[in-house]
Amino acid sequence: MSITRYGTVQKGAGGKPLPFARAVEADGWLYVSGQVAMENGEIIDGNIVAQTHKTIQNVLAILEEAGYGVEHVVRCGVWLDDPRDFWTFNSIYQQYFGEHPPARACVQSSMMVDCKVEIDCVAYKAKDK
């Protein structure tokens, strides 16, 4: 079995190096690390709507880089800073995952400063034989 790591040299807020891969692929499984609404090493300004769009776009970019699509996502984990954002988050989430809804857990959690949402996921794609 081979293991491929994506984004092992990355920087977070303030340009500090992050000690984990953005995603790891093994045997057809892709594990995407928690993504936030980060752009150029900083959390974007904005409400739950803007941050949810950016966070999901970051997840989709990693999936695409690894050769996966939204249809391959089997599970998502979601952390919301404010549980009152749940229904707003769901309406945006459905725009991206509506055709291929994965299993999902969603919990409230204190987040890093200015971060309103974090999403990780697991995707699976059968290897060509």
What role is predicted for each listed range?
Residues 1-57, 61-74, 80-129:
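N-terminal presequence-like segments and the immediate start of the first folded domain
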